[in-house]
From Swiss-Prot:
This is Ribosomal RNA small subunit methyltransferase I. The gene is rsmI. The lineage of its organism: Bacteria, Bacillati, Mycoplasmatota, Mycoplasmoidales, Metamycoplasmataceae. Catalyzes the 2'-O-methylation of the ribose of cytidine 1402 (C1402) in 16S rRNA. It catalyses: cytidine(1402) in 16S rRNA + S-adenosyl-L-methionine = 2'-O-methylcytidine(1402) in 16S rRNA + S-adenosyl-L-homocysteine + H(+). GO terms for cellular component: cytoplasm. It comes from the Bacteria. Its EC number is 2.1.1.198. It is found in: Cytoplasm. Belongs to the methyltransferase superfamily. RsmI family. InterPro entries: 4pyrrol_Mease, 4pyrrol_Methylase_sf, 4pyrrole_Mease_sub1, 4pyrrole_Mease_sub2, rRNA_ssu_MeTfrase_I, SAM_MeTrfase_RsmI_CS. One of its GO terms (molecular function) is rRNA (cytosine-2'-O-)-methyltransferase activity. It comes from Mesomycoplasma conjunctivae (strain ATCC 25834 / NCTC 10147 / HRC/581). It is an enzyme of class 2 (transferase).
Length: 238
């Protein structure tokens, strides 16, 4: 008997953004571990996936649930993990479970799908590599620590609360002024999806009633180097 846990990616807004494999896995699972069973039930109802045992699995009970999950696996039950939106473990519960599974020779599989940070980076138009820092902190000194010493060759992606958005943009402006470009997008894949791109001041001037889920990308502007002609001093006419 092979013990196995499957991570299933779910839509981040538009319920149509779910794969056929994800739906098949949800239908075939005996136990569905959910960040919030109420949110997950809406998705299952939409696709008429009925009579499933949903178990609340979140950051406050991750360790406590391991013995119960192990018991289910020993019974030969099929288990999958979903978060409220997107890929499990990415700024969501699940890393403890996955590490535990690896340490106990339990197979882990994943059904890929919609992801806010990848979608935001694709829409930004920024080139090069990127770094994902999870959620930006709410305290000023921690925010400064998170966004200090940026490399202009790297895009820095964070999730951010709408309640701290203006406050954070002002901190970024005070730190970098016009020397940084920002791509800010809210409600990815939803009806009210909207994005902004520009300097902190430009975005602050255009931002209205920040509500919803935001992803922010910071891109430090590269300083253009002026190449000097080493023969210039010899070419001047005297």
């Amino acid at each position: 008997m092979t013990k196995k846990i499957t991570l299933v990616s779910t839509p981040i807004g538009n319920l149509k953004d779910i794969s056929l494999r994800a739906l098949d896995t949800l239908r075939d699972s005996d136990i569905i571990l959910c960040e919030d069973t109420r949110v997950s039930q809406k998705l299952l109802n939409h696709y008429q996936i009925n009579n499933k045992k949903l178990i609340s699995y979140h950051k406050f009970n991750e360790y406590k649930m391991l013995d119960l999950i192990d018991n289910y696996l020993n019974q030969g039950l099929q288990i999958c993990l979903i978060s409220d939106a997107g890929v499990p473990t990415i700024s969501d519960p699940g890393q403890i479970l996955v590490n535990w599974a690896h340490e106990n020779d339990i197979e882990v599989d994943i059904i890929p799908g919609a992801n806010a940070l990848i979608s935001a980076f694709a829409l930004s138009g920024y080139k090069g590599s990127f770094y994902f820092g999870g959620f930006l902190d709410s305290k000023k000194q921690q925010i400064i620590k998170q966004i200090s010493l940026l490399d202009p060759k790297v895009s820095y992606i964070f999730y951010i609360s709408p309640f701290k958005l203006v406050y954070t943009l002002e901190i970024i402006r005070d730190l970098y002024g016009e020397e940084i470009d920002i791509f800010l997008i809210k409600e990815i894949t939803k009806i009210y999806q909207k994005y902004y791109r520009g300097t902190p001041d430009k975005i602050l001037n255009n931002l209205s009633a920040p509500k919803g889920e935001f992803t922010i990308i910071l891109k430090l502007k590269e300083k253009k180097s002026i190449k000097k002609n080493k023969y210039e001093q010899f070419s001047k006419v005297k």
